[in-house]
Amino acid sequence: MHESFADVAALDEHLARPTAAAVEALARLDGDVVVLGAGGKMGPALARMVRRGLDAAGLTARRVTAVSGFTDRAKAAALERDRVATVACDLMDRDAVARLPDAGLVLHLTGQKFGTGSDPARTWAVNTLAPAAALDRYAGARIVLFSTGCVYPLVPADGPGADEATRLEPAGEYANAAVARERVAGFLAARSATPLLLFRLCYAVEPRYGVIHDVARRVAAGEPVDVRMGWVNLIWQRDAAALAIRCLEAAAVPPAALNVTGLERLSVRALAERCGALLGRRPVFTGAEAPQAWLWDARACHARFGPPETTADEAVRMVCAWVARGGESFGKPTKFEVLDGRF
């Protein structure tokens, strides 16, 4: 799949377009849906995809509620126009979470990564208190809890990557807070026999954010591309959102974990050179490839759900086309090149 996007509206429509498999999964599942932490980079598109998927399945009466702090009220209003109910809520406030609407299906996106170096206490709080409140409120529901591939340690860059059996012994406060998020949620889910899937998402990308965006913008601006983290795995955000919906069926007792990323192991240097070819710029590099990297083995995901619809090169072409025409950026660098886990 390779699309070009004339504007933000066209891009947002694409990112919220459900796959046929996501529609079929929603048709098999029962209950209303709540999306916790829906105000971030991925949340609005995921909430819209759920709404559109239910509508496509003829289940228009089922309710979709997006929950976030919603400091940007325009974001909430836009969701409401698309028939997604919104609730402004501090997801670390157990009393406020207890008042959220009932749901049989929960997508939990709440988390904090950036700013950990300056405020580590808040990172630990967000990544543990919010899932604890959610697991109490929605005990018995099917829950997909977004996690990260950073829960694993760095692995040899020439190996297959960390799989779900790899010990969770990462570097850095953020990654360890992410492990704590999984442990707290797993404990509470097991105690209440709540079906839970730990969705270890590894570098979702779209034109305004992500590793490809970061590399493409640096190449376009003539800025050096850091290749110390020499290899990456990626997945197009629409594919990741569709998989999150499908993973509601994979939520299990005891909790299950799944690495969610693309099939291809990409060289950052080669990625920059590809962006340079598409943008008409010669990339500049800094650093040298380390012998280890954050890489993930997602064969279990692909065996169950099949490969993502969007290839890595299709994603590169879509991002570079967006960057070339001066499309907007979220202005949130991924810091993918970090090797010590300090974000």
PLM ranges: what are they?
Residues D32, L105-H108, K113, L129-E173:
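Conserved Rossmann-fold NAD(P)-dependent oxidoreductase catalytic core, especially the SDR/UDP-sugar
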Residues A165-L168, T194-R200, D214-D239:
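A conserved pocket-lining segment of Rossmann-fold NAD(P)-dependent short-chain dehydrogenase/reductase
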